[in-house]
Amino acid sequence: KIFEKWDLDFVIIGKTTDTNKLTLKFDNKVKGEIPINALASQAPIYDRKWIKKKLPDKKIDLKKLKKIKIEDALIKVLSSANHSNKNWITSQYDQMVMCDTAQKSGADAAIIRIHGKEKAIAVSVDSSANYCKAHPLTGGKQIVCENWRNLISVGAKPVAITNCLNFGNPEKPEIMGEFAECLIGIKEACEFLKYPVVSGNVSFYNGTNKKNIAPTPVIGGIGLISKFKKSFGHQFQDDNSAILLIGKT
């Protein structure tokens, strides 16, 4: 009914049965049958060796930090490409197609309204390869928490996440260790926040010229906004807008 309503092409390719088998037919003749358990609970499980990442024992030399002028540090931070205006990207496509976008790009999460409802969906996709490379366990936690923060910053209640886990060669114990520790971090953060993982994907053997990529788990989360007209923007509304700092810095 949904596909017909929006005039979308579709075809029914099968139906759910209670045979516990995946049955393949062609011209109404059975061409193959596969036990479902072989694709799920009875699928082979790899138990690869992995080692915990040895973190560098680095201590900050405060004497060296004192030599940095606060003016120079501020200019260096503000001139970073990470803080530059992104309009040159977002202005090249129609952000308001079908008028479903509740606010323009630039916020920590995108907001899409639901037809005929006051509700809206917030979406955020996050990753931090450098963080996960430095400390896989904390990096895994941080990505989930960042995704959560991005959703609540626009007024959404986080509902669920999916993931795309991108890593190097898992046959190398140190790479498998990055994978394992990132997963532990993601798991612990999701359990603490009660943030269910509804789907996911793993991509191994990523690298160039025999050099593995940094551990790059990507988290995509959605949240629900009960009334999209009350969603939060990312810009100051007037000169007297308050700035709230949450947590220690």
How should each PLM-predicted stretch be described?
Residues 1-249:
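Glycine/proline-enriched, intrinsically flexible loops and inter-domain linkers
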